[in-house]
Amino acid sequence: MMTRVFFAMFFLMALTEGWPRLYDSDCVRGRNMHITCFKDQTCGLTVKRNGRLNCSLTCSCRRGESCLHGEYIDWDSRGLKVHICPKPWF
Protein backbone atom coordinates (compact mmCIF):
# COMPACT_ATOMS: atom_id res chain seq x y z
CA MET A 1 0.00 0.00 0.00
CA MET A 2 2.74 2.47 0.94
CA THR A 3 4.59 1.64 -2.27
CA ARG A 4 1.55 2.60 -4.32
CA VAL A 5 1.21 5.86 -2.41
CA PHE A 6 4.90 6.63 -2.96
CA PHE A 7 4.71 6.01 -6.72
CA ALA A 8 1.48 8.00 -7.00
CA MET A 9 3.05 10.96 -5.19
CA PHE A 10 6.22 10.70 -7.31
CA PHE A 11 4.32 10.75 -10.61
CA LEU A 12 2.07 13.55 -9.38
CA MET A 13 5.16 15.58 -8.55
CA ALA A 14 6.65 14.74 -11.96
CA LEU A 15 3.51 16.00 -13.68
CA THR A 16 3.32 19.24 -11.72
CA GLU A 17 6.98 20.10 -11.15
CA GLY A 18 8.68 18.23 -14.00
CA TRP A 19 11.14 15.37 -13.64
CA PRO A 20 13.75 15.87 -10.92
CA ARG A 21 16.93 17.52 -12.19
CA LEU A 22 20.51 16.59 -11.39
CA TYR A 23 22.46 19.21 -9.46
CA ASP A 24 26.04 19.48 -8.28
CA SER A 25 25.99 20.86 -4.74
CA ASP A 26 29.47 22.35 -5.16
CA CYS A 27 28.48 24.54 -8.08
CA VAL A 28 26.50 27.72 -8.56
CA ARG A 29 24.44 27.51 -11.73
CA GLY A 30 21.14 28.54 -13.24
CA ARG A 31 17.95 26.78 -12.17
CA ASN A 32 17.02 23.46 -13.73
CA MET A 33 20.48 22.88 -15.20
CA HIS A 34 20.65 19.24 -16.22
CA ILE A 35 23.82 17.20 -16.72
CA THR A 36 23.77 14.00 -18.75
CA CYS A 37 26.96 11.94 -18.74
CA PHE A 38 27.77 9.39 -21.43
CA LYS A 39 30.99 7.61 -22.46
CA ASP A 40 33.99 8.23 -24.76
CA GLN A 41 34.97 11.88 -24.36
CA THR A 42 34.88 14.65 -21.78
CA CYS A 43 33.19 18.00 -21.71
CA GLY A 44 32.28 20.50 -19.06
CA LEU A 45 30.80 23.79 -18.00
CA THR A 46 32.64 26.70 -16.44
CA VAL A 47 31.08 29.66 -14.68
CA LYS A 48 32.93 32.91 -14.08
CA ARG A 49 31.56 35.56 -11.77
CA ASN A 50 33.47 38.82 -11.26
CA GLY A 51 36.44 37.40 -13.14
CA ARG A 52 36.79 34.38 -10.84
CA LEU A 53 36.17 30.77 -11.77
CA ASN A 54 33.51 29.45 -9.42
CA CYS A 55 32.77 26.08 -10.91
CA SER A 56 34.26 23.60 -13.33
CA LEU A 57 32.31 20.47 -14.25
CA THR A 58 33.50 17.62 -16.41
CA CYS A 59 31.77 14.45 -17.47
CA SER A 60 32.02 11.85 -20.18
CA CYS A 61 29.75 12.12 -23.17
CA ARG A 62 28.91 10.38 -26.41
CA ARG A 63 30.81 11.62 -29.45
CA GLY A 64 29.25 14.64 -31.10
CA GLU A 65 26.65 15.21 -28.37
CA SER A 66 26.60 17.81 -25.66
CA CYS A 67 26.96 16.67 -22.06
CA LEU A 68 24.90 19.58 -20.86
CA HIS A 69 21.20 19.82 -21.56
CA GLY A 70 19.09 22.36 -19.76
CA GLU A 71 15.83 24.14 -19.42
CA TYR A 72 15.44 27.79 -18.45
CA ILE A 73 19.17 28.42 -18.90
CA ASP A 74 20.14 32.08 -19.02
CA TRP A 75 22.11 31.88 -22.26
CA ASP A 76 22.56 35.68 -22.22
CA SER A 77 24.72 35.44 -19.13
CA ARG A 78 28.19 36.70 -20.08
CA GLY A 79 29.82 34.52 -17.43
CA LEU A 80 28.46 31.21 -18.72
CA LYS A 81 30.50 29.14 -21.13
CA VAL A 82 29.46 25.68 -22.33
CA HIS A 83 31.96 23.25 -23.83
CA ILE A 84 30.89 20.25 -25.88
CA CYS A 85 32.99 17.18 -26.64
CA PRO A 86 36.48 18.05 -27.93
CA LYS A 87 37.49 17.28 -31.53
CA PRO A 88 39.18 15.41 -33.05
CA TRP A 89 38.26 12.25 -31.19
CA PHE A 90 40.89 9.62 -30.59
From Swiss-Prot:
Span of the signal peptide: 1-18
Cellular component GO terms held in the UniProt record: extracellular region
Keywords: Bromination, Cleavage on pair of basic residues, Disulfide bond, Secreted, Signal, Toxin
Free-text tissue specificity from the UniProt record: Expressed by the venom duct.
GO MF term list: toxin activity
Methyltransferase in keyword set: no
The organism's place on the tree of life at top rank: Eukaryota
PTM remark: Contains 4 disulfide bonds.
Domain notes: The cysteine framework is XXII (C-C-C-C-C-C-C-C).
Family: Belongs to the E superfamily.
Name this polypeptide is given: Conotoxin Mr22.1
